[in-house]
């Protein structure tokens, strides 16, 4: 488990939602749902697991989550996210037709039915539902509440359900199109959670039946009311109109703005985009700028309509974007915008919590390091490393960490000037002298601690330069690596001693990072220099090819093989005379003698 995951686990909410595990490349490898995100996601990184789960956990380098308002929403969102991303560790779900919908047919006497195929022209659809059991349970309740056609009898012959008040598909009922349209709308309102009208009606019927001593009928009404209270299903992540739309929500705090975009395709929320950035104008103005840039990016498909929050001017967005802009006022559409806003708030808060934790962690690390070495808190640390291969192109590098963070503007590179051959001690002496002579000469602020990537010999050389030659008093520590080239020991004191440093401590991680960074910086510089020297040596001796022209070739072609493959005209285009270009080609392409 890496440090990022450790921090994120501490900040997870107790809300329901979906989580997305990612690998080192940022690819989503698993999507899951949870009643409680905090408990579920943490469970992956604690305790024992079966072989399959352990394999999944071994690949997790990061995770994201989307907060929902119910477990049902989380389940349906999970389905959509799996279908969209096809994570390799998820069971391969079938396509949309495998999920059941409840349908009201467009017949003269409409029927309620369960189907797995959606054809918008032949009915009104509700769903999809997680499984056939859930759809069947809801349909049974709808059958008891709404008198759609339930029989195969001809219209002039009433059925058993008619006598129960559950089927009005008969001529004796004198129903018309307006009646069925009204009933269809009642079902839609009911499934969207607006069930007060029906519950109130059932409550009155229950009371009336009890007053007339019809206790069995009253019990039926009571059971219906209880069934409705258990249902209360609000599927904000699904829309019945099957439209493509983008839903924007944003939240601002502490000078930062977070914008969340939900991508709804064919009525289903399948993906989200999150962006956080500092804002400098009014939030509404910066949001308009953001949404304009968002759709300038060709990877973002422009949908039929875009949902935006209430405080944004729709006409301004429409002018920028060029499609229908909607500010939902009520119902599930407004709830979806609110969900985007809620997730924007959660994401921004997580960013602040991570920053605060990181600050506490790095401040704690440098404070603990100071206490461990019995020196003032080392706010500024300068670290050095040498790099050469058998004495060729010897270089050194310095990296700087301020308050536990790399300060790259202060990094420095050194070409070794006075040392011939592979001599790490002499190279270290030269570099330390050059660096801190400049500090004295220019009145620069000296570091609170110098770290040498090396053992006792290099540290003693550095101390001799600092104390005896330059008269400075700067603490110097050494970092030794083991056979696997990993940070192993911290050397400090006079005489030098190994300082016990717990491997799981924040100060150890800080020193490990410093050592890795200075080594990386030195190696990179050395490779660049070797490549440049190799390039130049091959071009030496070619008449008319001086340092400036070599530099032009290096800048344009990057490597000798590229020059060898280039046409004469390409070389001339760099500002090289034709005669020199021809000599160059002949020289590079002649076989060695």
From Swiss-Prot:
An annotated GO cellular component: excinuclease repair complex
Localization annotation: Cytoplasm
Keywords per UniProt: Cytoplasm, DNA damage, DNA excision, DNA repair, Excision nuclease, SOS response
Domain spans labelled GIY-YIG: 14-91
Function in brief: The UvrABC repair system catalyzes the recognition and processing of DNA lesions. UvrC both incises the 5' and 3' sides of the lesion. The N-terminal half is responsible for the 3' incision and the C-terminal half is responsible for the 5' incision.
Subunit structure: Interacts with UvrB in an incision complex.
HAMAP family, per the entry: UvrC
Name of the protein in question: UvrABC system protein C
Organism: Streptococcus agalactiae serotype Ia (strain ATCC 27591 / A909 / CDC SS700)
């Amino acid at each position: 488990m890496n440090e990022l995951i450790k921090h994120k686990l501490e900040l997870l909410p107790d809300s329901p939602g979906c989580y997305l595990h990612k690998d080192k490349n940022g690819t989503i490898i698993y999507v899951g749902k949870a009643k409680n995100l905090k408990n579920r996601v943490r469970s992956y990184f604690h305790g024992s697991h079966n072989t399959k789960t352990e394999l999944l956990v071994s690949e997790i380098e990061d995770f994201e989550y989307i907060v929902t308002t119910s477990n049902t929403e989380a389940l349906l969102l999970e389905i959509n996210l799996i279908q969209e991303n096809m994570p390799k560790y998820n069971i391969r779900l079938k396509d949309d037709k495998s999920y059941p919908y409840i349908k009201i047919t467009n017949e003269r006497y409409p029927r309620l039915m369960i189907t797995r195929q959606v054809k918008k022209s032949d009915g009104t659809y509700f769903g999809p539902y997680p499984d056939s059991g859930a759809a069947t349970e809801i349909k049974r309740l709808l059958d008891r509440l709404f008198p759609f056609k339930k029989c195969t009898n001809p219209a002039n012959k009433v059925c058993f359900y008619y006598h129960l008040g559950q089927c009005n598909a008969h001529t004796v009922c004198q129903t018309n199109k307006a009646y069925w349209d009204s009933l269809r709308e009642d079902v839609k309102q009911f499934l969207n959670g607006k069930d007060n009208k029906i519950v109130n009606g059932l409550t009155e019927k229950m009371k009336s039946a009890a007053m007339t001593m019809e206790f069995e009928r009253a019990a039926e009404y009571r059971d219906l009311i209880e069934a409705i209270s258990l249902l209360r299903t609000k599927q904000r992540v699904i829309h019945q109109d099957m439209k493509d739309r983008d839903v924007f929500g944003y939240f601002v705090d502490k000078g930062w703005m977070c914008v969340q975009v939900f991508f709804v395709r064919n009525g289903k929320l399948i993906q989200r985009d999150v962006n956080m950035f500092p804002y400098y104008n009014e939030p509404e103005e910066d949001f308009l700028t953001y949404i304009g840039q968002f759709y300038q990016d060709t990877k973002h498909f422009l949908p039929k309509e875009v949902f935006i929050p209430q405080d944004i001017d729709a006409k301004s967005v429409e002018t920028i974007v060029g499609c229908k802009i909607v500010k939902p006022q009520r119902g599930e559409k407004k709830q979806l915008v609110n969900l985007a806003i809620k997730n924007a708030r959660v994401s921004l808060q997580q960013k602040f919590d991570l920053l605060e934790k990181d600050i506490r962690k790095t401040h704690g690390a440098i404070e603990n390091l100071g206490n461990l070495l019995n020196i003032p808190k080392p706010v500024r640390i300068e670290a050095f490393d040498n790099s050469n291969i058998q004495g060729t192109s010897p270089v050194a590098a310095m990296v700087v960490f301020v308050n536990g963070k790399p300060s790259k503007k202060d990094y420095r590179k050194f070409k070794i000037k006075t040392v011939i051959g592979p001599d790490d001690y002499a190279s270290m002496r030269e570099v330390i002298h050059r660096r801190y002579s400049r500090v004295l000469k220019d009145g620069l602020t000296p570091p609170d601690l110098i770290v040498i990537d090396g053992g006792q010999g290099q540290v003693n050389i550095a101390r001799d330069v600092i104390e005896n030659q330059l008269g400075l008093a700067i603490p110097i520590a050494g970092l030794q690596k083991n056979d696997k080239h990993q940070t192993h020991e911290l050397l400090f004191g006079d005489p030098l001693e190994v300082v016990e440093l717990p491997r799981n401590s924040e100060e150890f991680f800080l020193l490990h990072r410093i050592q890795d960074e200075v080594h990386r910086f030195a190696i990179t510089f050395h490779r660049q220099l070797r490549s440049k020297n190799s390039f130049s040596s091959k071009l030496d001796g070619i008449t008319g090819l001086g340092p400036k022209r070599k530099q032009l070739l290096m800048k344009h072609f990057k490597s000798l093989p590229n020059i060898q493959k280039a046409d004469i005209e390409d070389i001339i285009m760099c500002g090289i005379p034709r005669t020199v270009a021809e000599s160059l080609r002949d020289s590079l392409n002649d076989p060695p003698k």
